[in-house]
């Protein structure tokens, strides 16, 4: 598992998947937890993830809630890594959070995270995918641009985003815009 995670991180830094089969912009689906870390001990951080991943709790969590998890390195912004947890909908996220919170293995991983990262730098938020094009699961490199859209201006912002993406054609692989539904007062959307 450790070699696989390291391979994914390295290949993510070195490769680009620029084209996907469906580049038309459409309504998105899914609910996403973004967890931002400033990791000081990458090996210990990944080891904590591996220990949790090999637990019966992790198996139950994924099997029952459909949680899909990714670890990404990040450049800029004061955080070195993102853990992204994707769920099909809010009900599955709630089920996943309940299972995750009930396990000693997840508590042990969180303690290890505190020992391998700057805990006061940690933050998270939950988003819902508003618009998407292509299949982001096929990409290995992402931009994650966080923006604050003025309250009441989301429709015009989304229209401008559609115009931008329509004007670029197939220049991107996959892209989309997420609305932050809770967890962060500084960011209202993230563009990926």
What are the residue ranges of the model-derived segments?
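Bacterial N-terminal signal peptides
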Residues: 7-17
């Amino acid at each position: 598992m450790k070699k696989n995670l390291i391979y994914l991180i390295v290949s993510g830094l070195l490769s680009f998947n620029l084209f996907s089969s469906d580049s038309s912009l459409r309504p998105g689906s899914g609910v996403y937890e973004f967890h931002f870390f400033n990791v000081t001990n990458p090996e210990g951080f990944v080891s904590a993830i591996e220990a949790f991943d090999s637990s019966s709790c992790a198996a139950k969590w994924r099997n029952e809630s459909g949680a899909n998890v990714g670890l990404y390195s990040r450049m800029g912004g004061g955080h070195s890594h993102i853990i992204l947890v994707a769920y099909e909908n809010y009900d599955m996220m709630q089920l996943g959070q309940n299972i995750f919170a009930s396990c000693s293995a997840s508590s042990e991983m969180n303690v290890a995270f505190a020992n391998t990262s700057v805990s006061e730098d940690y933050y998270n938020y939950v988003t819902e995918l508003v618009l998407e094009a292509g299949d982001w699961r096929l990409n290995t490199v992402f931009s994650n641009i966080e923006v604050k859209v003025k309250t009441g201006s989301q429709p015009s912002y989304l229209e401008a985003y559609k115009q931008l993406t329509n004007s670029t054609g197939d220049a991107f692989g996959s892209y989309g815009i997420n609305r932050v539904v809770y967890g962060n007062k500084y960011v209202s959307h993230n563009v990926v």
